[in-house]
C-alpha cells in the first residue's frame, strides 16, 4: 500500500510505503517511559528503538518523570500504575495540569479490570479519556500497535 504525499510547492507527488511512513513518524515521536523497575524501562527502551522509535527516554520514579516532563516535550508517556513515590494515576493528574494533550498508555501487572483499579486508586477517576491500558508482561508488538493507535 502506498501513501501519496503532495509537496508544498508545485504538483510533485512523493510515494512512500506505509512502513516507510510509519518509520518516519516513529523517528519523530518522543516517548517517556516511567516505571520504578529499571529492567522494565531498559527493556522497553531497547525494544522501542529496535522498532524504529529513536527518541525514547526513561524515568525510574514519578518525581523524576515529572521533572523530565516539565523540561521536555513528549508525544506519548508510558506510565506504570504502581510506583512508590506517586502512583501512575496521580502522576497523570499532575502532567495533565501542564499538558492536556499528551497521549498516555498505562501499564500494570494487575490482572483486574479497570473499574477495580479505579476503586483502589482514587486519582484514576480523572482518566476517563484514557483508552490505553496494557497488562504486564507486555508483548512488544502489541505495545507498538497501541502506541501507533495513540499517536496517530
Residue ranges and their predicted role:
Residues 1-30, 135, 139-152:
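Non-catalytic signal-transmission and effector/linker regions of two-component phosphorelay proteins
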Residues 38-57:
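Two-component/phosphorelay signaling modules centered on CheY-like receiver
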Residues 58-67, 88:
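Helix N-cap/capping motif at the beta->alpha junctions
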Residues 67, 89-100, 120-122:
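Short amphipathic alpha-helix used as the core "switch/output" element in two-component signaling
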Residues 72-78:
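Active-site beta3 strand of CheY-like receiver
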Residues 83:
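Receiver (REC) domain active-site loop signature in two-component systems and cognate sites
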Residues 90, 111-132, 141, 145:
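Alpha4 helix (beta4-alpha4-beta5 surface) of REC/receiver domains from two-component response regulators
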Amino acid at each position: 500500500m502506498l501513501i501519496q504525499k503532495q509537496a508544498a510547492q508545485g504538483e510533485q507527488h512523493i510515494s512512500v510505503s506505509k512502513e516507510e511512513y510509519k518509520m518516519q513518524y516513529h523517528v519523530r515521536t518522543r516517548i517517556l517511559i516511567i516505571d520504578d523497575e529499571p529492567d522494565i524501562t531498559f527493556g522497553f527502551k531497547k525494544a522501542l528503538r529496535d522498532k524504529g522509535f529513536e527518541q525514547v527516554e526513561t524515568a525510574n520514579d514519578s518525581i523524576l518523570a515529572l521533572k523530565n516532563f516539565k523540561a521536555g516535550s513528549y508525544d506519548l508517556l508510558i506510565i506504570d500504575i504502581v510506583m512508590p513515590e506517586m502512583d501512575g494515576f496521580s502522576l497523570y493528574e499532575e502532567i495533565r495540569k501542564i499538558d492536556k494533550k499528551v497521549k498516555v498508555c498505562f501499564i500494570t501487572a494487575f490482572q483486574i479490570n479497570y473499574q477495580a483499579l479505579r476503586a483502589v486508586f482514587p486519582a484514576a477517576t480523572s482518566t476517563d479519556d484514557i483508552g490505553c491500558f496494557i497488562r504486564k508482561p507486555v508483548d512488544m508488538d502489541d505495545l507498538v500497535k497501541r502506541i501507533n493507535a495513540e499517536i496517530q
